[in-house]
A protein has these predicted regions:
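Bacterial N-terminal signal peptides that target proteins for export
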Residues: 2-14
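Hydrophobic helical h-region of N-terminal Sec-dependent signal peptides
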Residues: 14-21
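C-terminal motif of bacterial Sec signal peptides marking the signal peptidase cleavage site
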Residues: 24-27
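Bacterial signal peptide processing site
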Residues: 29-31
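Mature, Sec-exported extracytoplasmic domains of Gram-positive
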Residues: 34-412
């Protein structure tokens, strides 16, 4: 995953990015600085020599795989990532990929460490998280009296070498091994490099799947759920079906599906003047060709769920504005079971995993998909499984209603 160091200021419904620093690091989120000075924190962690004692060994274990991947321009290839994870495991290291698409190696070591945390015993472990940007994170964890201290170091591959680029330390403010088989922990880490640039620490939320998952489940997730995901849409948030599309927002779906259909970004963008909301008229054929490729829906039904002008046969389209911005941390759906139905559809049972909130099951839902002969797919329905343990979808900001839009821009 990518570490985004972004200072966000929320004012009058606007999100203004004041500074962006990109690191090839996994599992971190954005946090504004609360003070101009770093508080003096003393953490009982391993000596620097102990932290570095396995560094050279780890690099030597996998450097040839990185060389091969770079030569073939496949540093982000899943099978390459899998080979690196497995090589580390063969040499006794717990390892997993940053997208939790490969079963963790040496998971028993991690489970034993978690038991020692609960028992308030003293223990150490190194866990490696292989990223998709040509590098990996090394977590050196130390526990004592039930507290967990974290030393996280990022190693990047470049020009035939793997080098440590940044190291941070923190004590885990949140630590949990979940019923769904995830190790989730978080805290605010500091490093000299980071402080020079931001005068603050970085908030990190880490989610590592410890328990194995059937590869078929992961393939189904990658094929049907992850391409939609949760950013700026409610497809997996609300109940809907082909018989009743409910509150499914087809404008959000248009934004997500347009690039998949046309191979380029949606050309209908927000106005440069932030006080003005752009309004477009999209020809009927253009709008429907995007939606109907992924949904079995007729024109009449689609028109009833949108704003359609029958006089010129166009769909009104308003791109999301700053009032509809979302904080850039999202969950993902993970298939944990499936049923092949007699009508050719597939029912996917999935959990919503949200690393930012430290929750490996925000809620469970069922998604029905219809695979097509040409390799495509139609989405048939989504149903949230009722439970007292379900959490709210705090990441989502819906599009403005007609009334809200009129109140903001109607007088222009």
């Amino acid at each position: 995953m990518l570490l985004r160091m972004t200072a966000w200021f929320w004012k009058s419904g606007l999100a203004v990015i004041s500074f962006v620093l990109m690191f090839s690091i996994s599992g971190c989120s954005d946090t504004p600085p609360e003070e101009d000075t770093v508080s003096e924190t003393v953490i009982d962690v391993q000596d620097v020599s102990e932290e570095q004692e396995n560094e050279e060994e780890i690099i030597n274990i996998c450097i040839d795989l990185y060389d091969k991947a770079a030569e073939e321009n496949k540093l982000d290839d899943l099978e390459i990532i899998r080979s690196i994870v497995n090589r580390l495991g063969e040499n006794g290291y717990p390892a997993v990929d940053s997208r939790n698409q490969v079963n963790m190696t040496e998971a028993e070591q991690v489970l034993e460490f978690c038991k020692k945390v609960d028992a308030q015993e003293v223990a150490d472990i190194t866990i490696l998280e292989v990223g998709y940007l040509g590098g990996f994170v090394k977590y050196d964890l130390h526990t004592k009296d039930g507290n967990v201290d974290v030393v996280r170091s990022y190693y990047g591959y470049e020009n035939g070498e793997i080098q440590k680029e940044v190291t941070g330390r923190y004590q885990a403010e949140y630590w949990n091994y979940t019923e769904e088989g995830y190790l989730m922990f978080s805290g605010v880490w500091f490093s000299e490099e980071l402080y020079v640039l931001t005068l603050s620490g970085a908030e990190e939320h880490t989610a590592l799947r410890v328990q194995p998952l059937d590869e078929t489940y992961r393939e189904l997730s990658r094929k049907y759920l992850l391409p939609i995901s949760f950013e700026q849409n409610n497809m997996f948030i609300v109940d809907w079906s082909e018989e009743d599309f409910g509150d499914l927002n087809f404008y959000d779906m248009y934004d997500i599906l347009y690039p998949k259909v046309n191979g380029r970004y949606v050309p209908y963008v927000a106005d440069d003047n932030l006080s003005v909301s752009a309004v477009y008229r999209i020809p009927k054929e253009e709008f429907e060709s995007v939606i109907m490729k992924y949904f079995n829906i007729d024109s009449e039904t689609l028109q009833s769920k949108t704003v359609y002008d029958s006089e010129d046969s166009t769909y009104e389209y308003k791109p999301r504005g700053f009032e509809e911005v979302e904080y850039p941390e999202y969950p993902y759906s993970e298939v944990i079971g499936y049923t092949e139905n007699s009508d050719g559809t597939i029912t996917l049972a999935a959990n919503v995993v949200f690393p930012y909130s430290g929750n490996s099951k925000v809620y469970a839902h069922e998604v029905v998909v219809r695979p097509l002969e040409d390799g495509g797919v139609q989405y048939v329905s989504n149903r949230i499984i009722p439970s007292e343990d379900n959490s709210e979808e705090t990441w989502h900001t819906p599009r403005l209603t007609a009334e809200e839009w009129e109140e903001l821009y109607g007088g222009e």
